[in-house]
């Protein structure tokens, strides 16, 4: 199992900080949805018909017990109590509110999970 080192943690934490700012700019109207789209896709965030969806990578298809607990926490706290495992070894949360996405991503980052490189677009 791949274990994150300090470089990985710093990279993911910085991405979360950047995305938090980008979400604030989107919510304030400073960014249009078209301008926001490539920024959210870089972080595994898709706009569905009724809500945003967050796709999280499962590193090498393996989860630690701490990571599984964090996924459960995110499902309970930010979604509707469940997630969807994909055929590409990712998990999707389909009902996270845009304003809560940065907090969910920060929680996931503490467990070494993120949505980078999960966008097929």
Tell me what each language-model feature is.
Residues 1-121:
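Feature of Fe-S/electron-transfer and energy-metabolism proteins
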């Amino acid at each position: 199992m791949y274990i994150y080192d300090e470089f990985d943690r710093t990279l993911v934490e910085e991405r979360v900080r950047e995305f938090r700012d980008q979400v604030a700019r989107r919510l304030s109207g400073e960014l249009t949805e078209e301008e926001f789209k490539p920024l959210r896709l870089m972080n595994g965030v898709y706009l569905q018909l009724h809500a945003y969806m967050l796709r999280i990578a499962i590193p090498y298809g393996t989860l630690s017990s701490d990571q599984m607990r964090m996924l459960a926490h995110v499902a309970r706290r930010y979604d509707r109590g469940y997630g969807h495992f994909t055929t590409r070894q990712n998990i999707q949360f389909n009902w996270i509110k845009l304003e809560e996405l940065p907090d969910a991503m920060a929680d996931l980052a503490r467990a070494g999970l993120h949505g980078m490189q999960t966008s097929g677009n």
